From Swiss-Prot:
GO terms for cellular component: chloroplast thylakoid membrane
Primary role: Essential for the assembly of the photosystem I (PSI) complex. May act as a chaperone-like factor to guide the assembly of the PSI subunits.
SUPFAM superfamilies per UniProt: TPR-like (SSF48452)
NCBIfam families: PRK02603.1
Species whose genome carries this gene: Chloranthus spicatus
The name this protein goes by in its record: Photosystem I assembly protein Ycf3
Length: 168
């Protein structure tokens, strides 16, 4: 049974109903419709915390989806799951892949910055200031890109850039 039929959340049900209506009325190929169905089911599983099921759906959606913009969001969500699972190297890979297809995803730049900042903090705890500085510099670059795309957002990152004298 498709996940959209078993989810009890009101918002998810509403989204599923609207998505099903749109799938019927918007002229798209069967492959595009199938890709969207997997993407929708992946989002539903992800919101329930069922990451293994979400990944299966997202991987199938990436296999079917041909539009680069739509693929960027699928890849971004895969990155989110890997981030949640502590698989930061994989997460960075998927955020990069998402940005290759859609360079206007400030949330991907932000998440990459958070991972780099975290790795910098780990390096400080391990006493490796050179590596910490490199990770922090990389975090700064990603945060600058996120802020450039959405100037009113990422206030904490903006403040960190100022405090660490990395903001130009």
């Amino acid at each position: 049974m498709p996940r959209s039929r078993i989810n009890g959340n009101f918002i998810d049900k509403t989204f599923s109903i609207v998505a099903n209506i749109l799938l019927r009325i918007i002229p798209t190929t069967s492959g595009e419709k199938e890709a969207f169905t997997y993407y929708r089911d992946g989002m539903s599983a992800q919101s329930d915390g069922n990451y293994a099921e979400a990944l299966q759906n997202y991987y199938e959606a990436t296999r079917l989806e041909i539009d680069p913009y739509d693929r960027s969001y699928i890849l971004y969500n895969i990155g989110l799951i890997h981030t949640s699972n502590g698989e930061h190297t994989k997460a960075l890979e998927y955020y990069f892949r998402a940005l290759e297809r859609n360079p206007f995803l400030p949330q991907a730049f932000n998440n990459m910055a958070v991972i780099c900042h975290y790795r910098g903090e780990q390096a400080i705890r391990q006493g490796d200031s050179e590596i910490a500085e490199a990770w922090s510099d990389q975090a700064a670059e990603y945060w600058k890109q996120a802020i450039a795309l959405t100037p009113g957002n990422y206030i904490e990152a903006h403040n960190w850039l100022k405090i660490t004298r990395r903001f130009e």
